[in-house]
From Swiss-Prot:
Its EC number is 2.4.99.17. Monomer. It catalyses: 7-aminomethyl-7-carbaguanosine(34) in tRNA + S-adenosyl-L-methionine = epoxyqueuosine(34) in tRNA + adenine + L-methionine + 2 H(+). This is S-adenosylmethionine:tRNA ribosyltransferase-isomerase.
């Protein structure tokens, strides 16, 4: 049985990308081509991300996550004058949101907090591990006007105007995430146009990435880990495109682990209900580890993930544990850039 320690590796800190490259598609792409069937080593091909159209067949379907990152981080003050840090996790209504709150002493329901020295919110009920916050006006408007972009904890600079552009995908449409679907950051309009010209199909879903994506796994036995929950919407048009892709013998390619989680969660629920994949708008806490049976995704575009993370477990389940170990060894030797602003992989499902 695999344990948390099986997903650890040593990463030189200088390989953690701190800034985005000047051009989105100038990042590197490590193509990991698993052989047909389960046997044999994968072929590793060093590329540039701009070469992605060469790796994809006409008629294949790319599935993107069109979530948009909120300016969800605030510094504030309690009525007592104590400093507080707030990270909005999820919008729950026009004037309400769930948030993480860091303070020397937990705020009590009914108390007010001043955010960004601009407006007051009222603390409502506790919804573990979050607090309900009541805003004085439309919370999305206030968040976008006064909040700060919530860069990941391993990025060591304060967000600037470059981050406000580059920590969003060019196809971001639906505000609600507190972290970017980072595989999508490599796509620019010119690359999307080249994919269209080749006859590659495109479709979108929405999964609002939560702060839980950065939470470490704290138990050695993976079965004891409680996965965070995230909301997603899979439109019927995407379900229809997937069925058509399957019917003509083409492959479904998830852009990012967030797209993967939404697709596989919807397919698993559909299978359990004895029906074909269809539109879905719901929560998922799907935890994909080696041994999981993939139902939809044939290939995956994804960045390089943190040691001991649930996303490293996901890609290991998808491409094979040994394949991912060899891929990461190669990436470190070849000085690929890691994490959100880093380079990418194109993985093929091990049994595909």
């Amino acid at each position: 049985m695999l344990t948390l320690s099986d997903f650890d590796f040593d990463l030189p800190p200088e390989l953690i990308a701190q800034v985005a490259l000047p051009e989105r598609s100038a990042s590197r792409l490590l193509e990991v081509d698993n052989p047909a069937g389960a046997a044999g080593p994968a072929r590793l091909i060093d590329r540039r991300f701009a070469e992605l159209p060469e790796c994809i067949a006409p008629g294949d379907l790319l599935v993107f996550n069109d979530t948009k990152v909120l300016k969800a981080r605030f510094l504030g003050q309690k009525a007592s004058g104590g400093k507080i840090e707030v990270l909005v996790e999820r919008l729950t209504g026009e004037r309400t949101a769930l948030a993480q709150i860091r303070a020397s002493k937990s705020p009590q329901p009914g108390t007010t907090i001043r955010l960004a020295d601009a407006f007051d919110v009222t603390v409502g009920e506790r919804v573990e591990p979050f607090y309900t916050l009541h805003f004085p006006d439309d919370c999305l408007t206030l968040i976008e006007q006064f909040g700060r972009l919530p860069l990941p904890p391993y990025i060591e600079h304060d967000p600037d105007s470059t981050d406000e552009t580059r920590y969003q995908t060019v196809f971001a449409q639906n505000p609600g995430a507190v972290a970017a679907p980072t595989a999508g950051l490599h796509f620019d309009d010119a690359l999307l146009a080249r994919l269209d010209e080749k006859g590659v199909e495109r479709a979108t879903l929405t999964l609002h990435v939560g702060a839980g994506t950065f939470q470490p796994v704290r138990v050695e036995n993976l079965a004891e880990h409680k996965m965070h929950s995230e909301w997603y919407h899979l439109p019927q048009a995407l379900a229809d495109k997937i069925a058509a892709t399957r019917a003509r013998g083409n492959r479904v390619i998830a852009v990012g682990t967030t797209s993967m989680r939404a697709l596989e969660a919807a397919a698993r629920d559909a299978e359990a209900a004895g029906r074909p994949l269809a539109a879905a708008s719901t929560e998922t806490d799907i935890f994909i580890t080696p041994g999981y049976k993939f139902r939809v995704v044939d290939r995956l575009v994804t960045n390089f993930h943190l040691p001991k993370s649930t996303l490293l477990m996901l890609v290991s389940a998808f491409a094979g544990v040994e394949t991912i170990r060899e891929t990461y060894r190669h990436a470190i030797e070849q000085r690929y850039r890691f994490f959100s602003y880093g380079d990418a992989m194109l993985l093929t499902r091990r049994d595909a």
